[in-house]
């Protein structure tokens, strides 16, 4: 069998209510797989790359075709198994089991290196699934906008008395994840300077309204920042260039941003971070001809970038890693104090995780934006008193352009996910929305990831690297009846540095779906509360007790035991 990773084909998910598979439970993963490769969604769809360096939706185009065929023929009591983007088996299960089970990029720990993975990838034996690329629930840059927004808002609360008006953020990377940063900063009230080395990515963000304008030079960018901050306007500015050159230059000039982070694809030095002085074309060529030399050159450039971030940190500028493992890469080439500035999770997000709050998302399979607007209204109706959340939904409707099938991201926790899912299912049943809705989340969630340099950095009990938790999350979601469940390795921070799981559940308006939703959308966020309660976080222990969790080794929950 040939193993083509390139095909000149534009893929788009079907819209409307006509099925191309045998039920909505198999139509949903089919549409979401296709949606991941929509040219308006994916970063490089003709090569099956969705986002995050080489995060793919299928191993090769032959595997993609086979997955599509399998999903179209899948019966309501069968389960498709996908191994690193390749469909490997269809098995008889039962109607409440997942229709698809996915395992991507998983390697035995001793061999879990980029070097070994790249050898397997070259042989057609593996696929890097990132987080939502290989699990078919990527929704474009919107998927991380609210998390980035919440991070910036919390940083403003901690460092600037709750307001980012007249402030500016320095960052880099405008890919599928990093592309959320300029809009998130704007929504949080700040200006931003966003460095990106590929003009095509800047064009994509300008077209989708994630970035407001592009500067012609560093001097031009700084002049715009000075003007807009003085006026109290929140405008995002893109600058085409290499962060490893521009960020140190800003330090040299004595420029002082109000916040510094980075979201380049530093997790993958072979494909995701342009070495200083190289063109993108040269980078791609050398990645093939001299991979080890290319990796070293990329890491040395990251070291310069991180040293500049450390300089800002030492000036007292709030500086944080936004989860791309750039500190680790710099440390590996001699920046011994790379971890002096924190990651964003321990600095700003962990209290949310303790309550099971994370990136809940849903997609209208109809393709009709009105279905999303109706669900927005339903969220406001159910969560009546959360004005911060209402403000987010209003801003999202006004500012966020849908990419592919209409979708919404909304950070909610254990208290609300089940209620929202059941309400959405009822909207499908009653015809209030025109077709079923799928509910999923990022793997970046409170109970679904072990990543010592990101989500589980600096855990109170030192359990940063314990990866039993995402495995238990995947097993529980499978037992609870999620429509598809995924278990990945290496997302966000690269091979050897993370394990994580995902789930998606379909709201098709049936009683059977309601029962599955009730189980999945309680149990999934509950694993996050459990994980943090087990680590000794008081917020999580209180949440577990309040929400009726039965955690045998957490005394505060024993009143919930039957």
Swiss-Prot record:
Residues annotated as catalytic: 410
Gene name per UniProt: hutU
Pfam families attached to this UniProt entry: Urocanase, Urocanase_C, Urocanase_N
One GO molecular-function entry: urocanate hydratase activity
HAMAP family: HutU
Keywords recorded for this protein, A-Z: Cytoplasm, Histidine metabolism, Lyase, NAD
Family named by the database record: Belongs to the urocanase family.
Protein name (database record): Urocanate hydratase
Species the sequence originates in: Klebsiella pneumoniae subsp. pneumoniae (strain ATCC 700721 / MGH 78578)
Cofactor binding comment, as recorded: Binds 1 NAD(+) per subunit.
GO CC entries: cytoplasm
The keyword Transmembrane is annotated on this UniProt entry: no
UniProt function note: Catalyzes the conversion of urocanate to 4-imidazolone-5-propionate.
SUPFAM superfamilies: Urocanase
Pathway(s) annotated for this protein in UniProt: Amino-acid degradation; L-histidine degradation into L-glutamate; N-formimidoyl-L-glutamate from L-histidine: step 2/3
């Amino acid at each position: 069998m040939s193993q083509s990773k390139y095909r000149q084909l534009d893929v788009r998910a079907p819209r409307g209510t006509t099925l191309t598979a045998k039920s909505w439970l198999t139509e949903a993963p089919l549409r979401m797989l296709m949606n991941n490769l929509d040219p308006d969604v994916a970063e490089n769809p003709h090569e099956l790359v969705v986002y995050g360096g080489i995060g793919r939706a299928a191993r090769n185009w032959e595997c993609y075709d086979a997955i599509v065929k399998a999903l179209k023929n899948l019966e309501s009591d069968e389960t498709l198994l996908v191994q690193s983007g390749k469909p490997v088996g269809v098995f008889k299960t039962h109607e409440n089991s997942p229709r698809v089970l996915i395992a991507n990029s998983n390697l035995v720990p001793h061999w879990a290196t980029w070097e070994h993975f790249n050898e397997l990838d070259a042989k057609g034996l593996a696929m890097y699934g990132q987080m939502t690329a290989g699990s078919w629930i990527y929704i474009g840059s919107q998927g991380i906008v609210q998390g980035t927004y919440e991070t910036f808002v919390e940083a403003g609360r901690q460092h600037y008395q709750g307001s980012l008006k007249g402030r500016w953020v320095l960052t880099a990377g405008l890919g599928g994840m990093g592309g959320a940063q300029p809009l998130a900063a704007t929504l949080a009230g700040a200006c931003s300077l966003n460095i990106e080395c590929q003009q095509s990515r800047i064009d994509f963000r300008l077209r989708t309204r994630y970035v407001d304008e592009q500067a012609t030079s560093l001097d031009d960018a700084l002049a715009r920042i000075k003007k807009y901050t003085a006026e109290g306007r929140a405008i995002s500015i893109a600058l085409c260039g290499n962060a490893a050159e521009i960020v140190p230059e800003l330090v040299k000039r004595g420029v002082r941003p109000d916040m510094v982070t980075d979201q380049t694809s530093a997790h993958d030095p072979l494909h995701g971070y342009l070495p200083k002085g190289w063109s993108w074309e040269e980078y791609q060529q050398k990645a093939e001809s001299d991979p080890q030399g290319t990796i070293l050159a990329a890491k040395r450039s990251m070291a310069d970038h991180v040293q500049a971030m450390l300089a800002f940190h030492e000036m007292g500028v709030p500086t944080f890693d936004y989860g791309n493992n750039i500190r680790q890469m710099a440390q590996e080439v001699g920046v011994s104090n790379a971890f002096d500035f924190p990651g964003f999770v321990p600095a700003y997000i962990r209290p949310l995780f303790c309550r099971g709050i994370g990136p809940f998302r849903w997609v209208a399979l109809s393709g009709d934006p009105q279905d999303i607007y109706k669900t927005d209204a339903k969220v406001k109706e159910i969560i009546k008193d959360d004005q911060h959340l209402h403000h987010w939904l209003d801003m999202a409707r006004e500012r966020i352009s849908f990419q592919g099938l209409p979708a919404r991201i909304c950070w909610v926790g254990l208290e609300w996910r089940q209620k929202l899912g059941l309400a959405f299912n009822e909207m499908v049943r009653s015809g209030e929305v025109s077709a079923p809705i799928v509910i999923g989340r990022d793997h970046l969630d409170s109970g679904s990831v072990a990543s010592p340099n990101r989500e589980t950095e600096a855990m109170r009990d030192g359990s940063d690297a314990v990866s039993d938790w995402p495995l238990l999350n995947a097993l529980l979601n499978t037992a609870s009846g999620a429509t598809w469940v995924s278990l990945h390795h290496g997302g966000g921070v690269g091979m050897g540095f993370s394990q994580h799981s995902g789930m998606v559940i379909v709201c098709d308006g049936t009683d059977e779906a309601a029962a599955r939703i009730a189980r999945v959308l309680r149990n999934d966020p509950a694993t996050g509360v459990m994980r943090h309660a087990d680590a000794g976080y008081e917020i999580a222990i209180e949440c577990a007790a309040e929400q009726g969790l039965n955690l045998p080794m957490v005394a505060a929950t024993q009143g919930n035991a039957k």
